[in-house]
Amino acid sequence: MAVIFSLLLSIFGLFNLFGLNHDLFFRQFIYLILGFLGYYFLKSIGPHFFRINSNFFYWFFIAVLLITFIVGLEVRGSKRWLNFYFFNFQGSEFFKVFFILFLSEILTKKNLLFNSFLNFIKIFLCFLLPFLIIFKQPDLGNAMIYFFIFITLIMFSTVPKKYLGYLIGLVLLLVPIGWFVMKDYQRDRILSFINPHLDTQGTAYNMIQAVITIGSGMFFGRGLGLSTQSRLFFLPENTTDFAFASLVEQFGFFGGFFVLLFFTLIFIYIAKKTIRFYYEKTEDGQKNFLYCLGILTYFVSQTIINLGMNMGIMPITGITLPFISYGGSSVMAVLLGLALLP
């Protein structure tokens, strides 16, 4: 069921790209074909192989993140991609799925003494390592997705809740330090979100233009390829970060409603699986529960953050909208996550 709604969302995304950039449309079309072929291939294999090798995949992608940080393709001051000429590979997107798989395995081990604070520290370090690498790329948006996934899985695992309290307290203490560790443009984006009038032609420009673009679409939109804000480049990043704003300009609130509806139906599908596995008290049932919960957290948080950016109700963090934003790594990672659902 989820793959059907994913396909419908992908069609919306393709039409949106067709109205903006034909070259990107054809590239995304190829990415989607590869992604859906990969989805059915992985479905035929099943999640068991990836579960028993989750430790290997965790360290493999840690190595990928480190290599990306050192020799990755730099775009606007960020090193998030490995350039393979025909494809820019963003390891942090794919790693989300394997990070969830890794946590769902380690948090359900019967021989792991969660009453030991040392074991909790080990689990925390398994989160902190990729979080810091991604944060330093810098990619604050994806780093926050990893944080939400980790907090959610810890909350619903058998880890004593007092440790969760320690973790939340530590986060609150580190937030002021994090402010000074951020890049200047990241701090400016947050300040511009709080008060857009501080710099309407600078850091707040993208957010303001996104809101204008959504409003200009009205109910039925301007029509395919007839958008002005997007096609005339008043709206930057109109095929990636702000693809939803571009889509609403072309297809109106009517089109935007169906996009939100399809996302909601995917979330409901995964949530039903999550609830079903919650009541299975076997070790495999709890692994499946945590994996489904992690994927749900990943999809919901990424969708809400991107939509919030487009509507001007959340700071800009460079998060893509699954199936709608242009990008091979993003769409393939989401399909990977769906393919490994039990």
Predicted regions and their residues:
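Interfacial segments of multi-pass membrane proteins
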Residues: M144, F150-Y163, T228-G255, I319-G337
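Glycine/serine-rich anion-binding loops at beta->alpha junctions
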Residues: F86-F95, K136-P138, N142, M218, ...
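Hydrophobic alpha-helical transmembrane segments of multi-pass inner membrane proteins, especially
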Residues: V3-I11, F15-N206, A245-M311
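TM-adjacent membrane-interface loops and short helices in multi-pass inner/ER membrane proteins
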Residues: S192, P196-T240, F251-G255
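Proline- and acidic/polar-enriched loop/turn elements at helix boundaries
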Residues: N21, Y166, G225-L226, L260, ...
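Phosphate/oxyanion-binding loops and surfaces in catalytic or ligand/nucleic-acid-binding neighborhoods
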Residues: L14, G217, L338
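Nucleotide phosphate-binding site architecture
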Residues: T108, F220, M314
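A juxtamembrane structural motif centered on a specific transmembrane helix
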Residues: L17, K287, S301-P342
